[in-house]
């Protein structure tokens, strides 16, 4: 089974060195939450596989100097139009693999910035989605985020009019809303599981498999204005 934990935000200028600090904090915390997703001995730092736009993958250590150099390289690439990003993966025990891609530091008025973590695991495995979303949201200070999967996204598209091509905002089994979005959320939609940095709120919406509850929460949050897309052209990081 593959799950996604992802966050999005609008323009926020940051240097590759500043982004490296966020990446380091995230990558150093992931082994405690997903120990099965690497072959590294317990307690040892992971070495990640870095995927490039062209050419073979390379190894990347999650220390700040190497991360800053990799982000600077991407920032300076002729193929990069805004910000700097990385695409990393790690494989571990049988059936476990994670990939994480992200781009930040940009000032585009039309393309949101994002971090997307994908976790492939055995069907019966427990994945700490709430802890993962809380970690990523706390580090990256996004506008919104969610824990979801392809089936949920397809259902929202078919039954509730969700369309990612129109920059629609969605929520899955878990949702993260920045402060202004959280203030618009109607009472009774999910449980405020945790308040994070910047007054953002992590919402526990439904257990795995309860698609009806997710569709209902999505519609209620959307109709209340809590899932309003950032205006285009974007002039701020969060709603």
Where are these predicted regions, by residue range?
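Internal, hydrophobic cores of structured domains that mediate oligomerization or house catalytic pockets
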Residues: 33, 37-152
């Amino acid at each position: 089974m593959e799950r996604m934990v992802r966050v999005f935000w609008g323009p926020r200028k940051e240097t590759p060195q500043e982004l490296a600090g966020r990446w380091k904090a995230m990558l150093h915390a992931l082994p405690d939450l997903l120990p099965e997703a690497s072959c590294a001995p317990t307690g040892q730092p992971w070495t990640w596989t870095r995927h490039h736009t062209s050419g073979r993958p390379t190894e990347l250590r999650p220390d700040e100097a190497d991360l800053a150099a990799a982000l600077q390289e991407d920032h300076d690439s002729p193929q990069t139009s805004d910000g700097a990003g990385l695409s990393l993966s790690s494989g571990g025990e049988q059936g476990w693999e994670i990939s994480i891609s992200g781009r930040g530091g940009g000032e585009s008025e039309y393309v949101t910035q994002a971090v997307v973590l994908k976790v492939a695991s055995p069907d019966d495995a427990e994945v700490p989605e709430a802890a993962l979303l809380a970690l990523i949201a706390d580090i990256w200070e996004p506008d919104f985020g969610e824990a979801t999967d392809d089936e949920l996204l397809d259902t929202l598209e078919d039954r509730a009019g969700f369309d990612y091509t129109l920059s629609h905002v969605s929520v899955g089994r878990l949702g993260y809303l920045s402060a202004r979005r959280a203030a618009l959320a109607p009472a009774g939609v999910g449980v405020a599981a945790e308040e994070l940095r910047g007054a953002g709120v992590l919402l526990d919406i439904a257990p795995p498999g309860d698609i009806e509850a997710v569709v209902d929460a999505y519609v209620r949050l959307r109709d209340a204005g809590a899932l309003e897309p950032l205006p285009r052209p974007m002039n701020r990081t969060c709603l």
